[in-house]
């Protein structure tokens, strides 16, 4: 499953194209993460940077155990608690999102701003795209507030078929 880097794709199609500059996305994400962590006064350790890089390298929602397999460790692969703590940090800092329905993580396309995570997940090609919609985000906040609920976190996952897969049907 792939996740699109929204700033590099046409707004009308948030899913990645074959000609998409994947290496550029990884470089941009790591550079932006380093700058954000420095401004926020938190450390982007080598392990945190490497886990973030693994998440972005695949452009796919990636599970914690897949990350563990790809992390070289001094005595084999990294331990599950280490990877989960690292992913918790990256989520707290808004550098990655957890897609609950897939039990996987993706790089955040807009880590500089607090926002609600909205994902389109194609059941055909298994690609996923993070989208940003202020109207939908505002609606979520209004519904929560009307119920007297203090919304802290929201992830919306919409499953269907992307334009490419609908065209093949």
Language model: regions and residue ranges:
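Short coil turns linking two alpha-helices in DNA-binding domains
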Residues: 79-80
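N-terminal leader segment of winged-helix/HTH proteins
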Residues: 1-41
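Non-DNA-binding regulatory cores of transcription-related proteins
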Residues: 92-169
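Short helix-coil-helix linker/hinge
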Residues: 44-47
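Basic amphipathic alpha-helical segments that dock to polyanions
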Residues: 83-93
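A short acidic, leucine-rich amphipathic alpha-helix
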Residues: 66-72, 83
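Pre-recognition alpha-helix immediately N-terminal to the DNA-recognition helix
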Residues: 49-54
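Short capping segments at the starts of secondary-structure elements
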Residues: 58-63
């Amino acid at each position: 499953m792939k996740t699109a880097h929204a700033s590099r794709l046409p707004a009308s199609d948030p899913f990645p194209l074959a000609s998409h500059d994947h290496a550029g996305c990884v470089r941009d994400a790591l550079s932006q993460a380093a700058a954000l962590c420095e401004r926020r006064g938190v450390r982007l350790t080598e392990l945190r940077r490497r886990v973030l890089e693994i998440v972005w390298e695949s452009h796919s929602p990636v599970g914690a155990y897949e990350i563990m397999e790809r992390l070289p460790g001094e005595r084999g692969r990294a331990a599950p608690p280490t990877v989960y703590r690292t992913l918790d940090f990256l989520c707290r800092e808004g550098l990655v999102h957890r897609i609950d329905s897939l039990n996987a993580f993706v790089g955040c396309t807009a880590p500089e701003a607090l926002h609600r995570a909205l994902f389109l997940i194609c059941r055909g090609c298994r690609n996923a795209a993070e989208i940003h919609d202020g109207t939908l985000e505002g609606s979520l906040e209004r519904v929560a507030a009307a119920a007297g609920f203090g919304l802290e976190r929201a992830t919306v996952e919409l499953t269907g078929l992307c334009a490419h897969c609908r065209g093949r049907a």
